[in-house]
């Protein structure tokens, strides 16, 4: 007998490196949660990474972009999510210098689409996965310096600017509409996947 689902989480960018590890963690730790992965499978996403969970009855993969408002709203209507965790992003500094528009579209407009859907469908929590790149650079000759939550935003590329803009938009939705949000700004990640 299938256990009753206690929570449904839409994980955007879940076929990427960090997102897929989050998917694995959540399905292992919370077997009574439903995880819906929304990913358009750009250069950063790899569907084969999710192969170990494809047969899990509490997992669903949807190949769509967070910039596609109709697809996002349709998914929210089908799944009735409790929470959204947004890993989806264009995320390479050098690529952002070559083609900034795609970074603006995905990282800002895509976040806007998600925020509107969260507001419309009354989600309980939205988590924005951001980057420490929004803080700028630390001097190499000062290993004693660190970024912290109060460090001012000081972007240095189209990538970091697009992520900072998305973060500010998320905070604006919290303040304006009372949407429950959190933001994490992690540094580079590495590991086996």
Residue positions per predicted region:
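N-terminal Rossmann-like NAD(P)+-binding domain of SDR-like oxidoreductases, especially those catalyzing
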Residues: 2-192
């Amino acid at each position: 007998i299938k256990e009753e689902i206690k929570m449904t989480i839409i994980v955007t960018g879940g076929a990427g490196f960090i997102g897929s590890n989050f998917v694995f963690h959540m399905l292992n730790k919370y077997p009574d949660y439903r995880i819906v992965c929304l990913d358009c499978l750009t250069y950063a996403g790899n569907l084969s990474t999710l192969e170990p969970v494809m047969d899990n009855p509490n997992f669903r993969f949807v190949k769509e972009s967070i910039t596609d408002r109709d697809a996002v709203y349709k998914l929210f209507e089908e799944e009735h999510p409790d929470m959204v965790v947004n890993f989806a992003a264009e995320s390479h500094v050098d690529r952002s210098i070559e083609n900034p528009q795609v970074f603006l579209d995905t990282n800002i407009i895509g976040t806007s689409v998600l925020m509107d859907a969260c507001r419309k469908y009354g989600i309980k929590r939205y988590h924005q996965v951001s980057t420490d790149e929004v803080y700028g650079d630390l001097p190499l000759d000062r290993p004693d310096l660190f970024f912290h939550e109060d460090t001012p935003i000081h972007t240095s590329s189209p990538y970091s600017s697009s992520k900072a803009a998305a973060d500010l938009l998320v905070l604006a939705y919290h303040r304006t509409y009372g949407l429950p949000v959190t933001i994490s700004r992690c540094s580079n990640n590495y590991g086996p996947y």
